[in-house]
């Protein structure tokens, strides 16, 4: 390996950079799937992550006199974090809870249900004469942007928040799911 390194050291720097981008991206993605409860997937990803890391780190430690390899290593780490978050965002793994406060009672929940979303609604008041409806909607992350868009279209005055859900129990007979390509 040292023969071609002497001829093209910038190629080794590029390989180290790319290796770090891959292994840190995998690590970022692995960490996120751990928090979402996918233990087996995290273990599978972790195997490849550490194998790539060993190769990249080994080359840097073997050639400590070549400072640009350390720069490639650090640059790959930095870029890998960004790429890992981008990948996780594209996969949109898991569920999210959308809490929505609507001032137009008995309208928003029904219209959202008509679009195939499962909605739990509660009547409430804000301590004044103003009555409100509180909606809870647990939905796949990839469907949440469409749900938020629908809420904004149906009730521009609605207030909502979105939070991650680690696990969901749908009961012995799960309710029918919304089709993804609908």
From Swiss-Prot:
GO terms for cellular component: plasma membrane. It is found in: Cell membrane. The keyword Repeat does not apply. Keywords: Cell membrane, Membrane, Transmembrane, Transmembrane helix. The chain crosses the membrane at residues 7-27, 41-61, 67-87. CDD domains: YitT_C_like_1 (cd16381). Signal peptide: none annotated. Its main location: membrane. It is a multi-pass membrane protein. HAMAP family: UPF0316. Belongs to the UPF0316 family. This is UPF0316 protein Sde_0566.
């Amino acid at each position: 390996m040292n023969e071609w390194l002497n001829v093209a050291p910038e190629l080794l720097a590029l390989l180290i950079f790319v290796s770090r981008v891959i292994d840190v991206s995998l690590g970022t993605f692995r960490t996120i799937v751990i928090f979402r409860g996918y233990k087996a997937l995290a273990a599978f990803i972790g195997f490849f992550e550490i194998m790539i890391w060993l190769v990249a780190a080994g080359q840097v430690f073997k050639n400590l006199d070549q400072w640009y390899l350390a720069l490639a290593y650090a640059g790959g780490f930095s870029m890998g974090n960004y790429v890992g978050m981008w990948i996780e965002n594209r996969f949109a793994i898991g569920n999210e809870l959308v809490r929505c406060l609507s001032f137009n009672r008995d309208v928003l929940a029904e219209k959202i249900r008509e679009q195939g979303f499962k909605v739990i609604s509660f009547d409430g008041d804000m301590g004044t004469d103003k009555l409100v409806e509180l909606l809870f909607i647990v939905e796949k992350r990839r469907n949440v942007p469409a749900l938020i868009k629908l809420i904004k279209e149906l009730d521009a005055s609605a207030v909502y928040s979105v939070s991650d859900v680690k696990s969901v129990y749908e009961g012995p007979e799960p309710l029918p799911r919304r089709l993804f390509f609908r």
